[in-house]
Swiss-Prot record:
SMART domains: Frataxin_Cyay. GO terms for molecular function: ferric iron binding; ferrous iron binding. SUPFAM superfamilies: Frataxin/Nqo15-like (SSF55387). Pfam families: Frataxin_Cyay (PF01491). Coiled coil: none annotated. GO terms for biological process: iron-sulfur cluster assembly. The gene is cyaY. Involved in iron-sulfur (Fe-S) cluster assembly. May act as a regulator of Fe-S biogenesis. CDD domains: Frataxin. Keywords: Iron, Metal-binding. This is Iron-sulfur cluster assembly protein CyaY.
Length: 106
């Protein structure tokens, strides 16, 4: 994958997250902001999830209260380089814990 393909795929990931949060109808307040290639999800309790892109490595990084995760694209899924879990699974687990209610991005 070249840099422009990486950015296209990361932009697509950001857009999907933003769209899902735009349609969020849960009880808690969840905000999403993109600034300089960094996507920040802020929860009602003040906690945050930070998602950013690491262009030199062609990775997406996810920082949550539970820890940090690095994802490589394998096929059409972003996969954690340590646990083998998908980006969506780990994001949903973290968002659910930080929101205090079930959050789904799919």
């Amino acid at each position: 994958m070249n840099d422009s393909e990486f950015h296209r795929l990361a932009d697509q990931l950001w857009l999907t997250i933003e769209e899902r949060l735009d349609y969020w109808d849960g009880d808690s307040d969840i905000d999403c902001e993109i600034n300089g290639g960094v996507l920040t999800i802020t929860f009602e309790n003040g906690s945050k999830i930070i998602i950013n892109r690491q262009e030199p490595l062609h990775q997406v990084w996810l920082a949550t209260k539970q820890g940090g995760y690095h994802f490589d694209l394998k096929g059409d899924e972003w996969i954690c380089d340590r646990s083998g879990e998908t980006f969506w699974d780990l994001l949903e687990q973290a968002a659910t814990q930080q929101a205090g209610e079930t959050v789904s991005f799919r």
